[in-house]
UniProtKB/Swiss-Prot annotation:
It holds the Pfam family Transcrip_reg. It comes from Actinobacillus succinogenes (strain ATCC 55618 / DSM 22257 / CCUG 43843 / 130Z). One of its GO terms (molecular function) is DNA binding. It is found in: Cytoplasm. One of its GO terms (cellular component) is cytosol. Keywords: Cytoplasm, DNA-binding, Transcription, Transcription regulation. Its main location: cytoplasm. This is Probable transcriptional regulatory protein Asuc_1803. The lineage of its organism: Bacteria, Pseudomonadati, Pseudomonadota, Gammaproteobacteria, Pasteurellales. One of its GO terms (biological process) is regulation of DNA-templated transcription.
Length: 247
């Protein structure tokens, strides 16, 4: 699982820099509607919806807006025919890239995704070409300052698979993706504040990127995330602190 924190940092950097709030809200609402349609409107029993609600709240979306999106998903309507589509390919430096999209038009989506790979020196692959390099996991992030021993005990008691301290003092906790909600609840009940919790694709191996290749991968991520239909971008690129300082 090495390298995921670098991916998370890249993702958080992008989210912090992205001033297009309207586009962010559109993507969040799509996910809320789709999650509710697929798994029902009860966030307590629908891990995907729970994660979507948490993301929406973290982005300062109002409860009313969230509830309306959930109601649309449960009740059906013109905007509930979205399908999850995952595209796989290779980015700069031979990095493996997975692009998770929500779309009602596959042709439109592929016309957005493919040029991003091409312009950044990568190429779109076939289904399964890089997916085997990732595991679907639940990811919980705890900010710096938590007591490691107490957090580890709480995480294990809640059913977590693994806990990894990060260089910045934060902690990443991994779970079976189906058990993300239960583990999260257990950790919260133990008194710890959750910074982020989501279902993610965790790379099993990573590719070290030098100062020349790293910016190319970051550009690819930015271009993909700017596509309207793209919800999440996962990759196995590893950017060291030394290289990051040069960017």
């Amino acid at each position: 699982m090495a390298g995921h924190s670098k991916w998370a940092n890249i993702k958080h950097r992008k989210a912090a820099q992205d001033a297009q709030r309207g586009k962010i809200f559109t993507k969040l609402i799509r996910e809320l509607v789709t999650a509710a349609k697929i798994g029902g409107g009860d966030a307590g029993s629908n891990p995907r919806l729970r994660a979507a609600v948490d993301k929406a709240l973290a982005s300062n979306m109002t409860r009313d807006t969230i509830n309306r999106a959930i109601d649309r998903g449960v009740g059906g309507g013109d905007d509930t025919n979205m399908e999850t589509r995952v595209y796989e390919g290779y980015g700069p430096g031979g990095t493996a890239v997975m692009v998770e999209c929500l779309s009602d038009n596959a042709n439109r989506t592929i016309s957005q995704v493919r040029p991003s790979f091409t312009k950044c020196g990568g190429n779109l692959g076939t289904e399964g070409s890089v997916g085997y390099l990732f595991n679907k996991k639940g990811l919980i992030i705890i900010d710096a300052g938590a007591d490691e021993d107490a957090l580890t005990e709480a995480a294990i008691e809640a059913g977590a698979d693994d806990i990894q301290p990060q260089d910045d003092g934060s902690f990443e906790i991994y779970t079976a993706w189906e058990e993300l909600g239960d583990v999260r609840d257990g950790i919260e009940k133990a008194g710890f504040k959750i910074a982020e919790a989501e279902v993610s694709m965790i790379p099993t191996t990573t590719v070290d990127l030098d100062a020349e290749t790293a910016p190319k991968l970051l550009r690819l991520i930015d271009m993909l995330e700017d596509c309207d239909d793209v919800q999440n971008v996962y990759h196995n690129g590893e950017i060291s602190d030394e290289v990051a300082a040069l960017l």
